[in-house]
Design a protein with these regions (language model features):
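Glycoside hydrolase catalytic-domain context in secreted enzymes
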Residues: 1-435, 451-793
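Short beta-strand edge segments in extracellular beta-sheet folds
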Residues: 442-452
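Extracellular and select intracellular beta-sandwich modules with Ser/Thr-enriched
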Residues: 436-441
Length: 793
């Protein structure tokens, strides 16, 4: 059997110990549970409400007690063998003798969900709805239908009878209320009760339970930020846990934390404000349809809340915040300069009574200068090992001085250049953006320094203004877009005299010589996806050509685990959502998960994992925020790079997505993200750049949306001049599935593969008219073949 056999023959080849499968294995489930426990964030713990003392009697409330949301919908959904909900987790703790569960409340919800579930649309009914939706042009009505359809797939919160609450209070010591939210690809959330805000039924439940019980714990089971104001300061709510979406073991991991088997060490990857309206872009996100004006510019998330006057008071829980069951002490903090880097060190000591982990966060403050800067920007971070009481660990952090440079897109100092402005740069080290101490060392420049000269790329032409650090706005130049495109050099090689198969590339023939054997029609077919891949593949494949024995590369979703159709009968591991993983601040753990997920793809004869996803949490209502890591590009980029390293250690290609500015789902195929070059460089592209430079992803997926008037999949400036020429990306670029742009324009831009299907007739016409050349096609084909060689190693 040749080395490409796994792409041609589809039986699962177990990769585990003793011939066992790793896909959906107990070992992977345990890893998922461990990760979930490390990323859940303890937001409140008054009077040491948690962990529960052994023998505590608990009563469980909220329909999410049994209808636990393991992850979001769409490409991020995962078919797994089971999902352990909150009730399951506490029954396990009861079996272990740690708590006593008052079962009637949980059984009430179990029966309610069962009965209400009968009214949930069947698969056939949902398919009819999608047929109707797909036939419509995008409009608000279509958006509402999609939203209502997803909402109908989960039951509403139940009204718990007062009598049952009273009975529970008489038989339990503490109440645990779990509130859940679901979101999905294709539609955004809404700033309404039952979504971003609590519903009246949820408020009533909290009111009645907190009156009946002396103490209450609230667990939030959501992939993105929800409003916490209704209960944050309620004195009867002793503890709050943001549990995110914890994958197939999320309920068990929640019980682990509440019962003290795991000490929470998650820290927020997003700011949680006092209301949705606290976001600078709140109304613009709700009303924008054909375009979104990114007038908040670089002031996204904590960069806005910690900088702009009056915004700080709008924060409930700051970026990087999270509590522990123990206390930590920082000592011996040092900061200085060495070999073009800022270096810092600190010793962290556990001064509490139980083992725990702490996150050390290093921020810098740059001089405002002519360009204006956020008050704080995350520069580096590290997480300690599990420290026993009294144990210490010394951590070293560093980052390049050039990382503090700002992009001057208007020429205030040097146009289209990264600039370090003169003045004093200070450094702040601590456990959240607000819980820091200013270090003694300052990096001082007497003159402005040009770090790197670039060029104007993806320039906005219709964004009229942007926010400044003092809360005012500056006008931006407008005009007509100018789109650049280049030419691809012809491959200098000759085809062999006789046909040579792909198996011999690198042995008897070079890759360039091999490509010269392709006919034009074969080149055209090769740069488009196809859906006839056998086996468990359900998102199609690309590449593959029987005549020359080139194997296809089967693809698979998605960011929260290998997504296979239930009809395959192959349950996989549902990992915690990306936001939870970012809240671990543990890149080693994320890399371990990437490797485990990559092994599941390899075992099932797949080649490309359409993950991880890495767009910025600009607004909490984006329907796919659960797929993305953070509001901060450094944290997102480091998490993404770790995931990619893990995935590709298994010889599976990671496909980092969605490149770029895919920050909303409504009208996602045609919505234009109007954003300044500076915000693009410093916020929305920064995480991708970190991943490219640190992890060398083998593929990147362009997004559906437009950036400043151009679909990303046809943007030569984005895909070639910036991604390849500036960052040095060597891999292949694929479109997202069904993007609304011309295949020939994509080839010219440097987008190598059109998925899920190509447009061979359009490409052939473009070739015959001279719009594209054989050299253009060969360039993309070569990148696909180089990818194939990497995956097949």
């Amino acid at each position: 059997m040749d080395k490409y056999a796994r792409f041609r023959y589809q039986p699962c080849l177990p990769l585990g110990v003793d011939g066992r499968k790793v896909t959906g294995s107990p070992e992977h489930a345990e890893l998922s549970r461990r990760a979930a426990g490390e990323g859940m964030v303890l937001l409140k713990n008054e009077g040491a409400t948690l962990p529960l003392k052994r023998g505590t009697r608990v009563a469980l409330f909220g329909k999410a007690t049994v209808e636990y949301i393991k992850g979001g919908g769409g490409s991020g959904d995962v078919f797994c063998a089971y999902t352990h909900n909150i009730y399951d987790g506490f029954k396990l703790k009861e079996d272990e003798g740690k708590v006593s569960v008052f079962k009637p409340t949980a059984e009430f919800y179990k029966e309610y969900v069962k009965e209400a579930g009968k009214r949930i649309p069947t698969r056939a009914q949902i398919e009819k709805i999608w047929d109707r939706v797909n036939a419509m042009s995008f409009c608000k009505e279509k958006d509402d239908i999609i939203y209502d359809t997803f909402a109908s797939m989960h039951v509403a919160e139940a009204h718990m009878p007062d009598e049952l609450i009273a009975e529970a209070a008489a038989n339990a010591d503490i109440a645990i209320i779990t509130l859940s939210r679901f979101s999905a690809e294709g539609v955004d959330r809404k700033a309404i009760p039952g979504d971003y805000y609590l519903s009246d039924t949820e408020k009533s439940l909290i009111d009645r339970v907190t009156v009946a019980f002396p103490n209450t714990v609230i667990v939030l089971n959501s992939g993105a930020v929800v409003d916490c104001e209704y209960f944050a300061e309620n004195e009867k709510v002793g503890a709050i846990i943001f549990g995110w979406q914890g994958g197939l073991e999320g309920g068990t991991a929640t019980a682990d934390i509440i019962c003290g088997d795991v000490n929470p060490s998650g820290r927020l990857a997003d700011t949680i404000p006092v209301s949705y309206d606290a976001y600078q872009n709140a109304q613009e996100f709700l009303t924008g349809f054909e375009h979104l004006d990114y007038f908040d510019d670089i002031y996204v998330g904590y960069r806005y809340f910690e900088t702009v006057p009056g915004a700080a008071e709008k924060v409930r829980y700051p970026f990087g915040f999270g509590l522990s069951y123990t206390d930590f002490e920082f000592s011996g903090a040092f900061c200085g300069e060495s070999d073009g880097k800022i270096v810092a060190a600190v010793t962290v000591r556990n001064v509490g009574k139980v083992p725990g982990k702490e996150v050390v966060e290093l921020y810098y403050s740059a001089p405002q200068g002519k360009l204006g800067k956020p008050a704080r920007e995350l520069a580096a971070f590290k997480k300690t090992k599990l420290l026993s009481p009294g144990e210490s660990e010394s951590l070293a952090l560093s980052f390049d001085i050039s990382d503090m440079a700002s992009f001057d897109d208007l020429g205030k100092i040097k146009k289209s250049a990264f600039v370090l402005e003169k003045g004093a740069y200070s450094f702040h080290l601590g456990a959240s953006v607000r819980a820091t101490e200013k270090l003694k060392y300052e990096f001082v420049l007497n003159d402005d320094i040009i770090i790197k000269e670039s060029k104007s790329l993806c320039r906005p032409t219709k964004l009229e203004k942007r926010l400044l650090s003092d809360g005012s706005f500056e006008s931006l130049p407008t005009g007509e877009p100018v789109r650049n495109r280049g030419t691809h050099a012809e491959i200098e090689a000759k085809a062999p005299a006789e046909t040579v198969k792909f198996d011999e590339v690198g042995e008897t023939i070079t890759l360039d010589e091999f490509i010269k054997q392709f006919t034009v029609d074969e080149l055209i077919d090769f740069v488009g996806g196809h859906q006839n891949q056998p086996g468990v593949c359900n998102t199609g494949a690309f590449g593959g050509m029987k005549r020359l024995n080139v194997p296809p590369l089967p693809t698979a979703d998605g960011p929260a685990g290998l997504r296979l159709n239930a009809s395959t009968g192959v349950p996989t591991t549902a990992w915690p959502c990306a936001t939870l993983l970012a809240c671990t601040w543990n890149t080693e753990l994320i890399e371990e998960i990437g490797a485990a997920g990559g092994a599941e793809l390899r075992e099932n004869n797949l080649g490309v994992w359409l993950a991880p996803a890495m767009n910025i949490h600009r607004n909490p209502l984006c329907g796919r925020n659960f797929e993305y890591f953070s509001e901060d590009p450094l944290l997102a980029g480091k998490c993404c790079a770790a995931d990619v390293r893990g995935i590709q250690s298994q010889k599976i290609a990671a496909s980092v997505k969605h490149f770029a500015c895919n920050n909303r789902e409504s009208n996602r195929f045609e919505c234009d993200s109007r954003v300044s070059e500076r915000a693009l460089r410093e916020i929305y592209l920064r995480g991708f750049e970190i991943c490219v430079r640190e992890a060398d992803p083998w593929t990147i997926m362009s997004s559906y949306n437009l950036i400043n008037g151009s679909h990303t999949s046809v943007s030569y400036e984005l895909l070639t001049e910036l991604l390849r020429n500036e960052w040095g990306f060597k891999g292949a670029v694929t479109t997202d599935w069904g993007v609304h742009s011309s295949h020939s324009d994509e080839v010219l831009a440097g987008n190598d593969i059109k998925m899920g299907d190509g447009e061979p007739e359009e490409l052939k016409a473009a070739f015959e008219s001279g719009k594209i050349t054989r050299a253009d096609l060969e360039t993309s084909v070569k990148r696909i073949l180089e990818l194939t060689l990497k995956v097949a190693e």
